[in-house]
Each structure stands twice: as C-alpha cells, then as structure tokens.
Curated annotation (Swiss-Prot):
GO terms for biological process: translation. Binds as a heterodimer with protein bS6 to the central domain of the 16S rRNA, where it helps stabilize the platform of the 30S subunit. NCBIfam families: S18. It comes from Corynebacterium kroppenstedtii (strain DSM 44385 / JCM 11950 / CIP 105744 / CCUG 35717). Residues 1-21 are annotated as: Disordered. Pfam families: Ribosomal_S18. Part of the 30S ribosomal subunit. Forms a tight heterodimer with protein bS6. GO terms for molecular function: small ribosomal subunit rRNA binding; structural constituent of ribosome. InterPro entries: Ribosomal_bS18, Ribosomal_bS18_CS, Ribosomal_bS18_sf. Transmembrane segments: none annotated. GO terms for cellular component: cytosolic small ribosomal subunit. The gene is rpsR. Coiled coil: none annotated. This is Small ribosomal subunit protein bS18.
Amino acid sequence: MKRNNSKKVRVEPTRRPKKNPLKARGIEAVDYKDIETLRTFISERGKIRSRRVTGLTPQQQRQVATAVKNAREMALLPFTSR
C-alpha cells in the first residue's frame, strides 16, 4: 500500500477588521443624553452588551458603560426592562 507522505498545509483565513459602530456613525465621544445611540448597546433585558458583541474598542466600551450608567441615574434609561 502506498502512503501519502505530504503534510497538509493549514491555510488560515484572513481576518477582517471589526466594524466599529461609533466610528460608522461619526461619534467621537459618547454622550449620556444620546439615548438612541445608547439603546443599540443595551440588550432587551437592559444589560450592557459586551465588546465582543458590539465591536467597540476597550476605551469606547468604557465610555458607553459610563454613559449608560449616567443615563440610568438621570432616569433617561430604565435599569431593567420587563
């Protein structure tokens, strides 16, 4: 029986750069009064979505989290939604 001695070369797919939703909207700094933008980063249950889901940079994720918390304190966003 004949053996195939050639090794398979693994081809890794090229990574596409993540789409940044804030950059696409032209937003540099996140504002807690911009409720429409903040709602895109909140789940149906009222939780802040993770970076992996939203595609934000670490700095932007911190800004969004702080803005959401401020908006909740100012009663612009609910703490939970039922």
